[in-house]
Amino acid sequence: MLGLGVLYRLYERRLLREVRGGTMPRHIGLILDGNRRYALELGLSDPLEGHRRGADRLEQVLDWLEELEIRIITIYVLSTENLSRPPEELHRLLSLIETKMRSVATDTKIHGKGVRVRAVGQLGLLPVSVQEAIRAAEEATAGYGNFFLNIAVGYGGRQEIADAVQALLLERSREGKGLPEAIAEVTPEAIGKY
């Protein structure tokens, strides 16, 4: 009887062939959701184990993207809504993010592939130690440009829209445009650049 590992690899190859038959995106986004539920469904005693297993898949995801020649990925890790989780759960989750970001900064695969890491979101909402770990990963990979790994932490849909609109209006103001003219340029396409 074939082991699950062999079956999984066969299934993965089949999916890869099917995906390659279509148009490839240049940028994909992954929302990391359901890790707690996954851990509970597996009967794991610690829900954080689901988050750990998800974080450990990062290298495999990067391998897939390299195979598919997709150069940009944004991973949505921690929304502003997640920041209102119970303190103990949040502390453990933030600790996991910090540990993962520190390992990304020194990961030989990340450096070997030339992956540039960049964090987006309201980083000021995070503990200083997590911010420092994120900065370390960004600084360690700043010179790379083969692949781009955006880590969204402290993000929220409404906040992102507000930030993008503010950035657009500020840029138009610097160009000498008045408020009515700048407002006229607020379109989904224009704010999508921010």
Named regions from a protein language model:
Residues 1-194:
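Flexible, compositionally biased loop and terminal segments
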